[in-house]
Amino acid sequence: MTISEFESYLEKGLGRAILLLREEPDKTPFREAALRHLCTCGYLEVSYELDLISCFEDAECLAKEAARQNLAAFRAEEGCWNLLLLHALGCQKEIEEIIETRYCQYREKIRTSTENISCYHHNRIGYINTVYTILGDCFPTIEQVKAILPDLAYFFSGATEEDNRNDVIGIYTYLDERFGKEIAEDLLEEGYTYPYGDTWKRLMARYEPRPVDPNITAEELIRLTHSHDRKQLDFCIRSFRAAGTNIVHAVAEAFFAESDIERRHELLLLFLGNKTIPFPYPNRLMDFLTEEDWDAVDPPNVNKRTQYFFSVLSLLAEISHPRVAAIGKRLREGDAFRELGIHMLNANYTPEDLDSLVSYLDPTFLNTPLFNEAVCTICCLSDKGIEGLPLVELISLFENIPAFLRQRLVSSLIKKGLFPNDLREECRYDRNPNIRELIKELS
């Protein structure tokens, strides 16, 4: 294994980087590349990096050097993405000290530098990133969260731009996902008080989703879709999901009656946001497509009609129908939306499409969305029981397949009883933890 091959395998997260390194009698030439990887990776799971460290005889020294360099980068605000690795290397205390110092600095600067817009903007971004670091990477206690809430409320109340307020709303959303949406309410109920408490309550009210209206009429729902407010659109999509068949059909009829492209697209968002609700009139939808729509996919004609047209095609993509198959073929033979054309084969594949599908596995398409879509489609069709697909042949391309698709391929091979033994050990050390789990279950 050459150094460049080793670096390529590490970058792709392939288990062969670990296996082949273990077989090297002299690992010294690979140490610098390994250290470089340990100081530039940014993954949400670090078993792969810990396996890499364990390959070296001086594993403890390598771990200390990786920790030292990552801490230095973190102090310089260049390495926040490696906190999980630093945790695994036992640097919890150092991380908390750096974060506490940084948090206090940014908090003070935000309160004193508002007269300098660029300085304020820089400190605002630093503050927000630090809060996310505390909440996301430091496994915070409830006391740490309590300490942050007053500053967030202050920041929200003093924000003059919508983006500034959206930053705080984003953090509240994160708190919701991490701790449950009742956290701020619970803190208030237990008597925890702070300045700007009313502001924080208003923030929570703004974030809180509008309850679904079970009695909403089709007319009101159609009217409300004409809004650029994200909360309003979310309400419409959730209400549409709970609506009866009559409302679904009424929205579809409103779409056909509408002449404005933007309004048509807004109505289609109700279906796109509810994948379980099929568009009730697919044939009429296909009839609705015009050559003007097709022209909109070709530069320099890309415009609002392009987005609308893509939404229509996305609704048709899962429908098994000769006309949809023809649309998919036209897309694959064109210059735009070819990935969607490949995706349409999931519901409309015939043996005659095999050559077209396989053509996207050509080396000229490696590392492109077209290659990825072709691999995904082959796995999907194989899982449906379709025979004659080059599923096993994909093994030869294994190192060129992204980690999330490697997982799909491994799963499909296992389902078909075609998973090769010589790939088992490599997958056992893949960066993707889900691939490791699949192999563990196979054993």
Set out the residue ranges of the language-model regions:
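Extended alpha-helical scaffolding segments
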Residues: 125-150, 154-169, 374-443
